[in-house]
Amino acid sequence: MTVALAAFKGFPWKKVAPYALAQLAGAFVAALIVRWNYTEALAKADPGHTIKTQGVFSTLPANGNTNLPVTEWGALRDQIIGTAILLLLIFAVTDLLGTPPGANLAPFIVGLIVVAIGMAWGTNAGYAINPARDLGPRLASFLTGYGGAWRDQYGQLYFWVPIVGPFIGGVLGAGLYKVLIGRFLPDAEAEPPGLVPEPEPEPEKS
């Protein structure tokens, strides 16, 4: 999201790294709280802290189900598509040159978009659709006993998939919006220079 905003919306590139680190730190701390809160339950369900409960913190191909033959490459494709849809729709919802939702409804609608993507695209890779959302909790789980946090249920290095996929998909989705929709919207009309709006007259009292 942050990279796409910098590439297409004028967000300062010098702020991309601090914003990304802030998101990563937030996800990391949140995962530590979850890990702490469910210490006893996780120890009972999975004493070895294995792939069985890794999905509490981070994504896996087919959500760790070996009966669904999803590899890291299938999951990468899934992440690219899901994040592209997310960014295309976020740009559509927040573009003031179009018909944005009123009364500050944009955050609510973006939340619904994320839920919809999860319901439609969550089977293959758990819909991380944001590097920080996966990497932060994955790091937290690794530091608290999940030695296999970086690998999937097949033993393959998997941590890079929810990082690379959303980066590619985010730029792709934002670019598609700009090419297919954004460039056809009318330009914003600038206010004439030097004019001060006149106050509206007060209604006459009866």
Q: Model-found features: residue ranges?
A:
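Membrane-interface helix-loop junctions and terminal tails of multi-pass membrane proteins
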Residues: M1-S206
